[in-house]
Amino acid sequence: MMTTPTNSKPQLTSLRYRGYVQFAQVLMAFHGVDYDMCYVDKIDDQLRKELKFDQLPLFRETDGFKLNQSLAITKWVGDKYDFIGKSSKERALVVETVACVHTDIVMPAIRSVLTGQGRDRIINVVIPRYFGAFEKVLTENKYLACGDSLTIADLYCYVAYDYLGHLGFAPDHLQGKFPKIDCLKNHFESNKNVQEYLKKRPDDNEFFKNLPDWLKKDSCPTMSC
């Protein structure tokens, strides 16, 4: 059963896996946001009434404002904490990176785990192409948005990098190949709140191995979060 949201904290509701919601979780941990995390095993009728797109995650602000899409949630939180770039060019580069991570890296990786297909492409094309591009930018600039401060672009890069390792996509290919991204990973994981999140986060390998029957019926379960 879903817990009742409090009035004093935002609430994030998700299935018990990392998926796309982990970007918002790491973002809020990094900024020390105090919120209620509510994991559910299914979407019941009561919860479904609150979902604009019949999917999770669902984010509720203290004033009742709701968002039902992971990219919108991270944009909302990033905007509140001045984490989306200082200029229009930086913000455009943030959008470019976030879209790339979401669509070109994480989505095909999850799909590959679910279908058992496309693993070689993740290892031989996706990892070198996209993380190689991010590594090049970080070699030439301090941050991915080419400004003087971290943004959600850097966070998305780190989380995706860590996630592909978790899903078992050739950790040998990742180890030592992208030193600038490794530095980015170390920076985020040195944050005490992020460290606490890492201790408690779900294991997606177990989740996908025991995928609920109702999600198996979804023609594209990767889009549920």
UniProtKB/Swiss-Prot annotation:
InterPro entries: Glutathione-S-Trfase_C-like (IPR010987), Glutathione-S-Trfase_C_sf (IPR036282), Glutathione_S-Trfase (IPR040079), Glutathione_S-Trfase_N (IPR004045), GST_C (IPR004046), GST_superfamily (IPR050213), Thioredoxin-like_sf (IPR036249)
One Pfam match: GST_C_3
Domain of life: Eukaryota
Residue intervals of the GST C-terminal domain: 87-207
Keywords, sorted A to Z: Transferase
PROSITE patterns assigned: GST_CTER, GST_NTER
Keyword Transferase set for record: yes
SUPFAM superfamilies xref list: GST C-terminal domain-like, Thioredoxin-like
Binding residues for glutathione: R48, Q55, L56, Q69, S70
Enzyme Commission number: 2.5.1.18
Domain GST N-terminal, first and last residues per copy: 8-85
GO biological process: glutathione metabolic process
Catalysed reactions listed for this entry: RX + glutathione = an S-substituted glutathione + a halide anion + H(+)
UniProt-listed CDD domains: GST_C_Sigma_like (cd03192), GST_N_Sigma_like (cd03039)
GO MF annotations in UniProt: glutathione transferase activity
Family indicated by similarity: Belongs to the GST superfamily. Alpha family.
Record function comment: Conjugation of reduced glutathione to a wide number of exogenous and endogenous hydrophobic electrophiles.
Full protein name: Putative glutathione S-transferase alpha-4
Gene: gsta4
